[in-house]
A protein has these predicted regions:
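N-terminal intrinsically disordered, low-complexity tails enriched in polar/charged
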Residues: 1, 178-179
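Non-catalytic interface/linker regions that flank or bridge core catalytic/transmembrane domains
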Residues: 1-22
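All-alpha helical catalytic cores of prenyl diphosphate-utilizing isoprenoid enzymes
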Residues: 9-16, 29-41
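Divalent metal-dependent catalytic cores for phosphoryl transfer on phosphate-bearing substrates
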Residues: 28-32, 38, 45, 50-52, ...
């Protein structure tokens, strides 16, 4: 629980939107109704577990639980109002064509991924620098290679970036179902 100014308005934005019903992706991890919430909670569990484990105990000792929660639960806020449902024909087990729903992207705010989440969050609350950087860079080494120097420098300054990136990967590849 946080007393951060504006959190009530951010939570209202989340409740009124599709955060609880949106998928986390169109065809990969948690690509089902409620997948974004599921993924965010999985990242939260993976990230908070790191704080008490191995090398992360030292690296994250000064990072408040509140910051872990904000980063993990809101890192993909940019995926709200991002997906729509469309339909296509697909053969069922009997070989009969059926009209089936699938998720597609409708990016109304083409501002990047981590950057957009930071922008959306900061419409309501002020992020701490480590939170801002962690959310911005949470995709880690999937960034274009031209960004690797900046990413590496940022990770050295804020280990929370790497911890969130790893937690995101753990949730995606170890905790969630693929389609």
């Amino acid at each position: 629980v946080t007393k951060r100014e504006g959190m009530d308005k951010l939570l209202e934005f989340i409740r009124k939107g599709d955060f609880y019903t949106a998928p986390a992706s169109t065809r990969f991890h948690s690509c089902h109704e409620g997948g974004l919430l599921e993924h965010s909670l999985n990242v939260f569990h993976a990230l908070t577990a790191k704080k008490t484990t191995g090398i992360w105990q030292e690296k994250l000792k000064d990072v408040a639980y509140e910051s872990l929660a904000i980063c993990a639960l809101l890192h993909d806020l940019c995926k709200t109002y991002f997906y729509t449902t469309d339909y296509r024909n697909k053969k069922n087990e009997q070989g009969i064509w059926e009209r089936v729903p699938y998720y597609t992207i409708d990016d109304k705010i083409p501002y990047g991924h981590g950057e957009k989440s930071v922008m959306m969050i900061e419409e309501y609350i002020k992020l701490l620098p480590a939170e801002r950087y962690a959310i911005r860079w949470h995709m880690g080494w999937t960034e274009p290679k031209e960004n690797y120097n900046a990413l590496g420098t940022a990770m050295e300054k804020y280990p929370l970036i790497l911890a969130l990136h790893e937690a995101n990967l753990e949730a995606t590849y170890l905790m969630e179902e693929k389609q």
